[in-house]
């Protein structure tokens, strides 16, 4: 099965440095690897966001931090939007 391409928004790249500093780099990389294989795989569970964030998905890095992403199904691309803040 062909893997999905991951594309990182500028803020997500900046967030990753914070994630590493907080000791959550391995957890984030594990989630990114899951997204690369299948962005709809469960477990771990994902949340389909609503309201202003409609079209985005979220997975927990830990209790406080979320990995937020968008899935472009037609071209098999996952756009990583954020990895630090809680839905901002």
Regions picked out by a protein language model, each given a short descriptive name:
Residues 37-39:
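Blade/loop signatures of beta-propeller domains
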Residues 2-11, 17-18, 22-30, 43, ...:
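Enriched for short, Lys/Arg-rich terminal
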